[in-house]
Amino acid sequence: MVGGPRVVVALDFSDRKQLDEFVAKLDPGLCRLKVGKELFTTFGPAIVEQLQARGFEVFLDLKFHDIPNTTAQAVKAAAGLGVWMVNVHASGGRRMMEACREVLEQESHAPLLIAVTMLTSLSDEEIVEIGFPCSAQEMVGRLAVLAQSSGMDGVVCSAQEAPLLRRAHGEEFCLVTPGIRPAAAAADDQTRIVTPAQAITDGSSYLVVGRPITRALNPLDALQQIVKEVESV
């Protein structure tokens, strides 16, 4: 399941000039790009096409979560944009995820279909507060089982959950890990974080990295250092 660059740079920009200047500094041979809600809402589908025209594969990180037909049609639209990866919330349930898988089977281009388990910003206390009487790790495990049995290609998870998920779901199940920070970087707002080398060792397939690259004085150098660390494992 793993192929191509394993580092995915999160583009958290709202200013087009800053975005263009930043992307121009990156090498599509070293990374893929993640387009999230802020960027997509600000610039629309055209930004995906423009990034792809620069040679980058795009992870469309919109975390779709709705009734089955609505979510499936959104995933179909993402496939029509030619994205490399798209995600939905596993908590949307089996019928929703199966509807998304079924609609992609009819498309000439099918992106990787990934389920979000629990957001990496949530602590165990917050997970209990919103109504799940278990730890983050337990909830991730339950949702990952549901996702795989519903036809998902993999899940988004913290690298702290990756070893257990890798053992439980096999080598072909894709594990996409945000919350990646080089050792010297601050944790920012993601509670469950690990370094790139540790994440790969623990079984992660792809690493989502944001601020350590986007806020670096030399983004390409920061990217190269992370890629080097990943390839050293």
Swiss-Prot record:
Substrate binds at residues 12, 34, 61-70, 120, 181, 190, 210-211. One of its GO terms (cellular component) is cytosol. It is an enzyme of class 4 (lyase). The active site is at K63. Pathway: Pyrimidine metabolism; UMP biosynthesis via de novo pathway; UMP from orotate: step 2/2. InterPro entries: Aldolase_TIM, OMPdecase, OMPdecase_AS, OMPdecase_bac, OMPdeCOase_dom, RibuloseP-bd_barrel. Keywords: Decarboxylase, Lyase, Pyrimidine biosynthesis. Its EC number is 4.1.1.23. GO terms for molecular function: orotidine-5'-phosphate decarboxylase activity. One of its GO terms (biological process) is 'de novo' UMP biosynthetic process. SUPFAM superfamilies: Ribulose-phoshate binding barrel (SSF51366). It catalyses: orotidine 5'-phosphate + H(+) = UMP + CO2. Catalyzes the decarboxylation of orotidine 5'-monophosphate (OMP) to uridine 5'-monophosphate (UMP). Homodimer. Belongs to the OMP decarboxylase family. Type 1 subfamily. This is Orotidine 5'-phosphate decarboxylase. It comes from Hahella chejuensis (strain KCTC 2396).
